[in-house]
Amino acid sequence: MRWAAATLRGKARPRGRAGVTTPAPGNRTGTCAKLRLPPQATFQVLRGNGASVGTVLMFRCPSNHQMVGSGLLTCTWKGSIAEWSSGSPVCKLVPPHETFGFKVAVIASIVSCAIILLMSMAFLTCCLLKCVKKSKRRRSNRSAQLWSQLKDEDLETVQAAYLGLKHFNKPVSGPSQAHDNHSFTTDHGESTSKLASVTRSVDKDPGIPRALSLSGSSSSPQAQVMVHMANPRQPLPASGLATGMPQQPAAYALG
């Protein structure tokens, strides 16, 4: 009986030692139970060996699936037992009608961003065009002002020249001019000789009376001579000439 009791005691001791799976928290060498991997899910060990205390696991679900539960698990002490922070997550399939709204929202956001970008570009383009038009207007205004100044200066110059010419051509009242037309004077002997030759030709012409011939003018070499060219459109003054006689230049000698 004593032997049987000792045998039972020896068998009971190893059983009790083998039954202790988790050591005391002071050892910090416990392990967490293995997790069951959910269907269509993957996990990644971020820290630890996958079961020891301090291990961190991250779960992921494929596309068109939604994770139910926490995707980040940590092996920690809870009293004297090492356990995971939460249960393993589950990947749930998302129906198509639920993803349709998400897709529509994404497309709408993209379209709105494109519209905003286009409007901003159009605004910038309009601003640039306005700046270019303003610069062109300024240049045209400057050129117009310059041309107007040049025209005013030219007009003043022309008016001054016209007024000076008009004053120069204005007839002077006096006994030396008989008609309002162009005349020239000279006091050289050469002009006197030319006038004498003209007088001889006039004297030789039988159709011209002697009253028009020059007398004594060729003898003075310093005599001032003025020749008047009568206007052919105006009739000559009646000084002894017949109406049927041809009009010829009249020569006068001023002593």
Curated annotation (Swiss-Prot):
Biased composition (Basic and acidic residues): 179-191
GO annotations of cellular component type: plasma membrane
SMART domains xref list: CCP
Every Sushi domain range: 30-93
Alphabetic keyword roster: Cell membrane, Disulfide bond, Glycoprotein, Membrane, Sushi, Transmembrane, Transmembrane helix
One Pfam family matching this protein: Sushi
Function, in words: May play a role in breast tumorigenesis by promoting estrogen-dependent cell proliferation, cell-cell interactions and migration.
Protein name: Sushi domain-containing protein 3
Organism: Homo sapiens
